[in-house]
UniProtKB/Swiss-Prot annotation:
InterPro entries: P-loop_NTPase (IPR027417), RapZ-like (IPR005337), RapZ-like_N (IPR053930), RapZ_C (IPR053931). It comes from Xanthomonas oryzae pv. oryzae (strain KACC10331 / KXO85). This is Nucleotide-binding protein XOO1280. GTP binds at D57, V58, R59, S60. Belongs to the RapZ-like family. The lineage of its organism: Bacteria, Pseudomonadati, Pseudomonadota, Gammaproteobacteria, Lysobacterales.
Length: 282
């Protein structure tokens, strides 16, 4: 996976999302070093078992036109290199820079921000024209953006059903795109334990606390029975992924724990594409 685009459009968020899904990621890699990087990662490992994501943009200060030649050569070795190009409107980019107070990568040229954005569009045009997908992030918040990366690109091809286990806080609303929704507020709440309150459902302390609760074990068993029965029936559906969402009060402990627990179970059952997304944490 090659991640490129305009500075401020979300490339770093995309790479972090791929990293969370067990991709080996490298950012700001010069194009001329890409072949050696890929070879080093594939050495001694089957191509099908390697998931790489590389960030390439104007910071690399290399000849971006070389990328098309490398992608053609990579196909001969059975390497699929999908190029994603992220962009946003000038207005959205200027607002993001104002909010974060970061400097544009081309500011060293003595350009004002609008001129730097225009210049970057020109420099990255060789990448944009060969992109497999162009994603405009102007109107997306970070949660919508991460979800789109996960569901459309990171989970794999559309010829097999992928599972996305999500956690959320009810006070912020139920995810509209969820196919299954389970209420974890019926479970004991680690929030009331002062030592567990600052942790999340991914931390060992919270996991141990909930693992030892009889109601949690019963709740988990019943959900496993339901999902194991009905998820396989969806394999013949036209959809490419299914979202299973767990909600609790704050989206921090119980819902995160259940999403992670069910994702582990799905992987143990042999589902090839499984991801987690914690809306209030990621």
């Amino acid at each position: 996976m090659i991640v490129s685009g305009l500075s401020g459009s979300g490339k770093s968020v995309a790479l972090k999302t791929f990293e969370d899904l067990d991709y080996y990621c490298s950012d700001n890699l010069p194009v001329e070093l890409l072949p050696d990087f890929v070879k080093s990662r594939l050495r001694g490992n089957p191509i099908g078992n390697q998931r790489l994501a590389v960030g390439i943009d104007v910071r690399s200060r290399s000849d971006l036109t070389q990328l098309a030649q490398w992608r053609l050569a990579a196909q001969e070795y059975g390497i699929e290199a999908l190029l994603l190009f992220f962009e946003a409107s000038d207005e959205a980019l200027i607002k993001r820079y104002a909010d974060t107070r970061r400097r544009h990568p081309l500011s060293h040229l003595g350009l004002a921000l609008p001129e730097a954005i225009t210049r970057e569009r020109q420099l990255t045009e060789p990448l944009r024209v060969q992109a497999d997908a162009i994603i405009d992030t102007s109107t997306l918040n970070v949660h919508q953006f991460r979800r789109r990366v996960v569901t459309e690109f990171a989970l794999g091809s559309n010829d097999r059903l992928s599972l996305l286990f999500e956690s959320f806080a009810y006070k912020r609303g139920v995810p509209a795109e969820a196919d299954f929704v389970f209420d974890a507020r019926v479970l004991p709440n680690p929030h009331w334990d002062p030592e567990l309150r600052p942790l999340t459902g991914r931390d060992a302390g919270v996991r141990n606390y909930l693992d030892n609760e009889a109601d949690v074990r019963r709740y988990s068993t019943q959900i496993v029975d339901l999902l194991d029965t009905w998820l396989p029936r969806l394999r013949n559906d036209t959809r490419s992924y299914v979202t299973i969402a767990f909600g609790c009060t704050g989206g921090k402990h119980r819902s995160v724990y259940m999403a992670e627990r069910m994702a582990r179970h799905a992987r143990e059952q042999g589902w090839p594409e499984v991801a987690t997304f914690h809306r209030e944490q990621d």
